[in-house]
A protein has these predicted regions:
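Structured catalytic-domain cores with a bias toward divalent-metal coordination
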Residues: 1-334
Length: 334
């Protein structure tokens, strides 16, 4: 545990207890020789404690996470009562500049971990982050959104069978906690291999700033910091109105036809088997195809594209869930 370390050293700079520091992680240059830097904002209490690492924009087009971390910094939630909070609002600066998910070479940073110091640009960023920043963390929070036009209900993703992570997910308490296996070369997998608990938050869609999603992320972070006895006493933590729903299994529903896509339900909604989720029509008024729920479950992702192709992922639905009480069901359907 880092709570016994008085002097924190990141990228050659030493930060003592009680200090605030912003370190610019210089990763590369633009074609114009302009430096590209990743600001790392470090806040240390005078009182020792754990270190929480908060990151966003591993994918450069995922704006909700950037706004969540910005609010944490702006509202000084990142100034801990004890311990250290390291905040990186934009990890993929190249992608953010281009409002693009990937790096300029098309590489996905979240498929490049733990990285290689002589590899692609994305791999180099992953390498230096993994070796220079991540080792200081006792807990990680990583903010994401759905890709393209796919809107994610507020959820955290955790490894099946990890009781400690499930406990932290229940503390974070967004509507859903989805049990999902780690993918190779992801940040989450790297944390898992190093034994660092990570809460991966998903909410909303790319290239959008959604105030409701942002509020879920900010409130969840406050709850987790409060649980770790790191949240300053000037901040209030509201008791959640309901427990997170644990999604043990889920599946994607794919479009059986190509055409105009008309949604009939909302993300977050609990639907019955056979419920009409959407219709797909041709542009000429001759074809209409109903997309029906294959089972009872929660809709945790909705494709909001106006046009879909056959085979496109259009809904993510739970196939095994904890059924809510009646009043909780009403809240989910709001």
């Amino acid at each position: 545990m880092s709570e016994f370390i008085k002097t924190l050293e990141i990228l050659g700079e030493k930060i003592e207890l009680g200090e605030s520091r912003t370190i610019d992680f210089n990763i590369a240059k633009l074609y114009t020789s302009t430096n590209i830097e990743i600001p790392i904002i470090i806040e240390r209490s005078i009182h020792p404690g754990p270190t929480v690492l908060i990151t966003a924009a591993i994918h450069g087009d995922e704006i909700n996470g950037v706004e969540i971390v910005r609010q944490l910094i702006s509202r000084k939630i990142n100034k801990p009562k004890r311990g250290t909070i390291i905040s990186i609002p934009i990890l993929n600066v190249f992608g953010f500049l281009n409002t693009d998910r990937a790096f300029p070479d098309g590489r996905d940073l979240n498929r490049s971990f733990p990285g290689n110091r002589r590899g692609s640009l994305a791999s180099r960023v992953a390498y230096f982050f993994t070796n220079e920043v991540l080792p200081h963390a006792d807990y990680c929070i990583d903010f994401h959104t759905g890709g393209a036009s796919r809107f994610n209900a507020p959820q955290v993703r955790i490894n099946p069978g990890d009781k400690n992570l499930l406990k932290l997910a229940k503390v974070f308490n967004v509507p859903f906690s989805v049990l999902s296996k780690n993918l190779k070369k992801t940040y989450r997998t790297t944390c898992n291999k190093k034994g660092i608990p990570i809460i991966l938050f998903e909410g909303g869609k790319s290239l959008e700033s959604n105030s409701q999603i942002v509020n879920y992320g900010v409130r969840g972070t406050k709850r987790l910091l409060y649980y770790l006895d790191m949240l300053d006493s000037k901040f209030n933590v509201t008791n959640p109105s309901r427990d997170t729903v644990v999604i043990e299994k889920s599946r994607w529903i794919r479009a059986q036809k190509s055409g105009l896509f008309h949604l009939k339900i909302k993300c977050n909604q609990l639907v019955e088997k056979g419920a009409i989720l959407a219709t797909i029509t041709d542009p000429y008024g001759k074809m209409k195809f109903n997309v029906m729920a294959p089972n009872k479950g929660y809709i945790i992702n909705v494709n909001q594209a106006p046009i879909v192709h056959q085979g496109d992922a259009i809904f993510h639905i739970s196939t095994k869930d904890n059924q809510p009480k009646e009043e909780e069901r009403e809240m989910l359907n709001e």
